[in-house]
Amino acid sequence: MLSQAIADYTLHRSTSDPLPSGPAPFTSSEFFKLCRPGTKPKAKNWDHHLSTECRNRLPSNLKASASSVKPGLDGAPIIPQRQISLGAGRPIPEYFPWDSLELSGKQSRGSPVDEAVVMPCTRGEDDFDFAVALNYGYAAGSPQLLRFITEHIEMIHNPPYDDWETCLTSGTTSAMDTVFRMFCDRGDWIITEEYSYPGAIEAVTPLGINILGIKMDGQGLIPEDLEAKLRSWDSAQGRKPSVMYIVPCGQNPTGATQSAERRRKIYQVAEEHDIYIIEDDPYYFLKLHSRLESGEVSPMPVDEYLRQLPPSYLSMDVSGRVVRLDATSKILAPGLRCAWMTCCSQIAEKYMNYTEVGSVAPSGFSQVAMYKLLDVTWGHDGFIRWLAFLSHQYRQRRDALVSACEKYLPPDLFTWVVPEAGMFLWLHLQSPTPRISCSSYSECSIEKEKTALLDLEERIYNRSMEKGVVISKGSWFAAEPDQLKGIKLRLTFATAPLDSFDWAVKQFADAVRSEL
């Protein structure tokens, strides 16, 4: 399966026009797709979902005029025979203090004994001119890296409509903040899981955007609760929510992964109520599967690994109502601050209107590093092998943390669901204790109950810190803090040394017991 797809893209590259060159050249996913234009339906128009700010934001004339390659009427790049720029305030490369960059990295399967691979990039080279990489870039990214990412998206997700685009971002957090502003005005509502990524919550709060939390179970957001809350929406609360932010795989903080059937039901509700979906999926490739069997020491074959990945919302999106955010922070390195998003061309163009006067483009250093690693050194096969290797490594770490929890956290103290993806274990503290300061727990008012729960959570957090173990409070992730019920805590198996889990969980267990 993978080998045939790679062969198809190799042939497609060999018969395609050369990549656009020069400073900040216009480029587009349309140049690199295997599927011919016009073979799938077009996306819907989303003007009615855009914020006032987004509708008023226009492309940057200065950025458009500065591009060395521009689109023609048919969308194809116009490449002039000769061009002298007396317009752009772009420094001449002779004044850049760097001439070359040399990176050393791992083979794709990630073995620590692998011989290092050297990846140079030099000024004036045909492959990716380092001088061009260091200059102002095009908002969608460099043609070299965008080609690889477009192929990757088509290979893995194959969006079922025609006019989809991928563009690079300066990290998913930055892209997420921009997308919220594109779709929401002050006073609007967005939908999230009842426990959600704090970065999203903290991004929308100062924008005056309200959050509607939807109940969750072991598979994440519950579509029946979503449908019920939308169907019974009271217009006195404001405009009915039209945007939903979700993390469908290894959800942060709960670790829940939505099944294929769950996703189809949620997408159907979105279609019926005209909801635009922000699919934030940094843990998609960290598929953990069941717990490792004794003697299972190697990652699974790449085709089997790919078959077991769940269908993304992008892969089932027939109307262009999904913007998918992919991250490098969990699969390459957080400091790259270079990721990608995929959506219909209308939304991609609106997004680039923002970046042209904001981040402009992802770092040229990061784009070079990613291109030289992903395309030149690994290729698509090597990239997938790396992802399968990472999944296997995190699977071992997940198993080690769960084993330590089974050893020190009895079910009368905590319960949890073993995560199928991601980096997190979500602990549910069983019934709070008599130390809650009410005449009787059942008689506490809602406000007293909330105060008591937060107080106990704070004491557990501080006691754990005193014992040398950092945990995350569940209240940090509550989409609607006023609806807080019970005490939940998040542990991660991503950071600490593997051999420290046993000690850390024991200390944490002692900290909890000392406060009960």
Language-model features: locations:
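Eukaryotic N-terminal low-complexity, Ser/Thr- and Lys/Arg-rich leader segments
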Residues: 1-75, 79, 228-240, 294-305, ...
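Conserved core segment of the aminotransferase class I/II
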Residues: 5-33, 311-395
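Conserved core of the PLP fold type I
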Residues: 14-15, 20, 26-29, 109-274, ...
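N-terminal small-domain helix-loop-helix segment of the aminotransferase-like
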Residues: 37-170, 515
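Conserved PLP cofactor-binding pocket of PLP-dependent enzymes
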Residues: 83, 450, 459-490
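Conserved glycine-rich beta-strand-loop-beta hairpin in the small C-terminal domain of fold type I
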Residues: 387-402, 413-432, 438-447
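PLP-dependent enzyme catalytic core of the Aspartate aminotransferase-like
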Residues: 466, 479-516
